[in-house]
């Protein structure tokens, strides 16, 4: 414990001098938030063969990927699972990877794809033949379905509060639009982050995309980026025919979700552009009536922090999303919450997606408090507070969105809206308003 306190102090000390700060002035809301919290370090304290940092993610139709780490390199990449506690009637082997960074060694990172699994069913599982028993519930195969959403998590007391509030109400899938651990090359922080979220991420699938804090260019001849992220957070890119772990898609219930990469090429000649174009063309709105997109850098924002950083990506990809009739676009990066009217090409458009910035998970850099004034008529609601969101898809036509502000022991609903998919509007469905993808 003493070593962990020293480690936490050294990390906090270095980050204090190396990290940018958000000026806490010109507050655009009447809700007052205390200063940012220090890092919340979670130690292991178990034998080396014990699985740790357990999390799950969707991995194609009726399958789940279980990821865990062991310090002992001899532990098998294997998951036992079944529908009853301590009774595992199935066992699946997987793969493993590892990486080094100067004197740091990641240990053995295991990825095991299990299934086929039944929808809306609780499974019990054990990793590597050792350690604790975990359990998860698979998402439903049809509506309703509920997503919990929070970006820019980090690992502070505010992160803990956000995760606690999310845990209080059930959900089916967690969406994280980038900036996970805020390790920023301090590799032990990846381990601490994995331990911090294990109690939640081992029970429901976490679907994530990368942010700028995941870039972590390694000081090698080839300057590899995203090495830690790609090793630890293997998403279903192969299952969605993407050649990169930085962008992919997945289906759950009646929702097709596309996770885009803000920090990998997206221009019209890029692999990501061609993959996105092909992916959207294959969407069958009879099978997946809802279409959701998640990315890190917002295309629309009225906050002064990172203003305009998503403009090039918007110019390259927005028309694809519009023609595909995307319903909702989530982003992070700006440490605030903001919800826009349906937009296309910087104008209100009832056939465009509803854009939501939700980079308020609890990161160490604090909140982005400086909004542009007066408030744009396109911006429906904005507030600089930590919290999380809930997207509940009720049926093929109706959905409900709510944003839950972290308020001491309670998680109060500060913003909510019920809406219908633009796809169901005869005006928006007309080919007169849509071109080919």
Curated annotation (Swiss-Prot):
It holds the Pfam family Metallophos_C. GO terms for cellular component: extracellular region. It is found in: Secreted. Belongs to the metallophosphoesterase superfamily. Purple acid phosphatase family. PANTHER family: ACID PHOSPHATASE RELATED (PTHR22953), PURPLE ACID PHOSPHATASE 21 (PTHR22953:SF105). Homodimer. This is Purple acid phosphatase 21. It comes from Arabidopsis thaliana. The gene is PAP21.
């Amino acid at each position: 414990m003493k070593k962990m306190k020293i480690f936490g102090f050294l990390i906090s000390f270095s980050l204090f001098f190396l990290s940018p700060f958000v000026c806490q002035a010109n507050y655009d809301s009447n809700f007052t938030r205390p200063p940012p919290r220090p890092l919340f370090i979670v130690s292991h304290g178990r034998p080396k063969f014990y699985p740790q940092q357990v999390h799950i993610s969707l991995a194609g139709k009726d399958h789940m990927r279980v990821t865990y780490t062991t310090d002992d390199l001899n532990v098998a990449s294997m998951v036992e699972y079944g529908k009853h506690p301590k009774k595992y009637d199935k066992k699946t082997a997987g793969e493993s990877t590892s990486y080094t960074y100067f004197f740091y060694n990641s240990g053995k990172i295991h990825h095991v794809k299990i299934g086929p699994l039944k929808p809306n069913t609780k499974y019990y599982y054990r990793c590597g033949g050792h350690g604790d028993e975990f359990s998860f519930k698979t998402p439903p195969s049809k509506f309703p379905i509920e997503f919990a959403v929070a970006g820019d998590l980090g690992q502070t007391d505010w992160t803990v509060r956000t995760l606690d509030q999310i845990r209080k109400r059930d959900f089916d899938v967690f969406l994280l639009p980038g900036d996970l651990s805020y390790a920023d090359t301090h590799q032990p922080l990846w381990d601490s982050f994995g331990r911090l979220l294990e109690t939640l991420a081992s029970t429901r699938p976490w679907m994530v995309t990368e942010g700028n804090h995941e870039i972590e260019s390694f000081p090698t001849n080839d300057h590899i980026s995203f090495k830690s992220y790609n090793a630890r957070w293997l998403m279903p890119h192969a299952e969605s025919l993407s050649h990169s772990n930085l962008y992919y898609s997945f289906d759950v219930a009646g929702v097709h979700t596309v996770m885009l990469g803000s920090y990998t090429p997206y221009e019209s000649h890029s692999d990501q552009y061609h993959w996105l174009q092909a992916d959207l063309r294959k969407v069958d709105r009879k099978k997946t009536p809802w279409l959701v997109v998640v990315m890190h850098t917002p295309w629309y924002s009225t906050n002064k922090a990172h203003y305009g950083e998503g403009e090039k990506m918007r110019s390259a990809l927005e028309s694809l999303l519009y023609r595909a009739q995307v319903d909702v676009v989530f982003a992070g990066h700006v440490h605030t919450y903001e919800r826009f009217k349906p937009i296309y090409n910087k104008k209100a458009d009832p056939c465009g997606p509803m854009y939501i910035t939700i980079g308020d998970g609890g990161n160490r850099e604090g909140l982005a408090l400086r909004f542009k004034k007066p408030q744009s008529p396109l911006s429906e609601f904005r507030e600089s507070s930590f919290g999380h969101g809930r997207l509940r898809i009720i049926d093929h036509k109706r959905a409900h969105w709510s944003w839950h502000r972290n308020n001491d022991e309670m998680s109060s609903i500060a913003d909510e809206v019920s809406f219908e998919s633009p796809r169901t509007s005869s005006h928006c469905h007309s080919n007169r308003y849509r071109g080919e993808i």
